[in-house]
A protein has these predicted regions:
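Gly/Ser/Thr-rich phosphate-binding loop
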Residues: 1-40, 53, 60-63
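Active-site glycine-centered loops adjacent to acidic/histidine catalytic or metal-binding residues
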Residues: 15, 46, 103, 127
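Conserved ATP/PPi-binding loop(s) of AMP-dependent carboxylate-activating enzymes
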Residues: 24, 32, 47-51, 62-92, ...
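Generic short beta-strand
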Residues: 39, 53-54, 104, 201
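Conserved beta-loop-beta connector loops within the AMP-binding
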Residues: 51-73, 109-110, 172-176, 211
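AMP-binding/adenylate-forming catalytic core of the ANL superfamily
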Residues: 76, 81-82, 89-92, 104-191, ...
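Acidic/polar alpha-helix N-cap and adjacent early helical turns
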Residues: 217-228
Length: 228
């Protein structure tokens, strides 16, 4: 509809300050193909840009096969040489000559990359990886949820469990049990929130990014794990 109204074409790119330019690009032609033939591609940030290599790697820095979720890593002439006066951070980010983006994602058989979540926002509960964005998407489908952020909080049995921080619609009577049950019908049971906090506002920075560190800190301050 927007393409018809504004008489324009859409593209999609993915990059970060450390990569200077994009590392993945979905061209206008690929966008049109997605609209007409393969709508799931609209969730992709595209394929590796010109002269750029992109791989999905596991926690041991090994390349993963098609469809598996891991860290998005990139290599190319546009990648930074390092952080100014931060040797240790530079070596970690550029391990093996590949930029480790900190983003979790997967690649399909055509090379299209799909971003799943930030690695640091992934919740590991009882050995299962839970991506906060998936749980948040389920919560946002509830008509009484105005805003939502999902975090992991300490749990003696599972290491950490899912907690939802919710801003509900004014005058809503929705309860913790209502939202947990709502999620259970939409995502795997082990991914559903184990608890819900109702808050007045989800903390965000100037660019609108959710400050999950602020939400996590009260729960992790007495734990050995470092909040990042």
């Amino acid at each position: 509809k927007a393409m018809d109204v504004f008489k324009c074409k859409f593209g999609q790119g993915f990059g970060m300050t450390e990569t200077v330019a994009v590392i993945c690009l979905m061209t206008p032609e690929e966008h049109i193909r997605a609209l007409n033939e393969k709508p799931e591609l609209l969730k992709s940030c595209g394929r590796p840009a010109l002269d750029t290599q992109v791989e999905i790697r596991d926690e041991n820095d090994n390349p993963l096969p098609v469809g598996e979720i891991g860290q998005i890593c990139a290599k190319g002439p546009q990648i930074m040489k390092g952080y100014w006066n931060k040797k240790e951070e530079s070596e970690k980010a550029l391990k093996g000559g590949w930029m480790h983006t900190g983003d979790a994602g997967r690649m399909d058989e055509e090379g299209f990359v799909f971003i799943q979540d930030r690695i640091k926002d992934m919740i590991v509960s009882g050995g299962e990886n839970i991506y906060s964005t998936e749980v948040e998407a389920a919560l946002f489908a509830h008509p009484d949820v105005v805003d939502a952020a999902v975090i992991g909080v300490p749990d003696e049995k599972y290491g950490e469990v899912v907690k939802a921080c919710i801003v509900k619609k004014e005058g809503s009577n929705v309860t913790e049990d209502d939202l947990i049950s709502f999620c259970k019908d939409r995502i795997a049971s082990y991914k559903k929130p184990q608890s819900v906090d109702f808050i007045d506002e989800v903390p965000r920075n100037a660019s609108g990014k959710v400050l999950k560190k602020v939400l996590r800190e009260p729960y992790w301050k007495d734990q050995e794990r470092q909040v990042s």
